[in-house]
């Protein structure tokens, strides 16, 4: 890993441990030799209170490219979520995670995770990634909300 990438991820980890939003977690995975793998993180994002997502703790992986922070990490829900902006693979479709759109090297892990949390209850309908969730969100909001609440129960901590 480049020294810029390593330095930035070490600093991000230090900042996160010092100050992170309530209910979230983010930590580097363990490497095969038992050390920390700063390039791959396990993350948990809680559903926002007073939304259909409340009560769930949604697990993601963050994979950082060698070129981080010039290029954004890839964020994937594991297991994939039913959501208009989550591809069937679990990959999150969000402008700040796209080099050609909103990514800037100054964006922090904390900002990414808060952005994903906001996206859960406020999908970007202009950028659908999952046909079934998108269609249900547009045509049958009641059924969509029911499905989201069931998903929150399945993802309770």
Curated annotation (Swiss-Prot):
InterPro entries: Ub_conjugating_enzyme, UBQ-conjugat_E2_core, UBQ-conjugating_AS, UBQ-conjugating_enzyme/RWD. Keywords: ATP-binding, DNA damage, Nucleotide-binding, Nucleus, Transferase, Ubl conjugation pathway. Pathway: Protein modification; protein sumoylation. Its EC number is 2.3.2.-. It comes from the Eukaryota. It is found in: Nucleus. One of its GO terms (biological process) is DNA repair. Residues 4-157 form the UBC core domain. Belongs to the ubiquitin-conjugating enzyme family. Catalyzes the covalent attachment of ubiquitin-like protein SUMO/Smt3 to other proteins. Required for efficient recovery from DNA damage or S-phase arrest and normal mitosis. This may be as part of a checkpoint independent recovery process. PANTHER family: UBIQUITIN-CONJUGATING ENZYME E2. This is SUMO-conjugating enzyme ubc9. It comes from Schizosaccharomyces pombe (strain 972 / ATCC 24843). The gene is hus5.
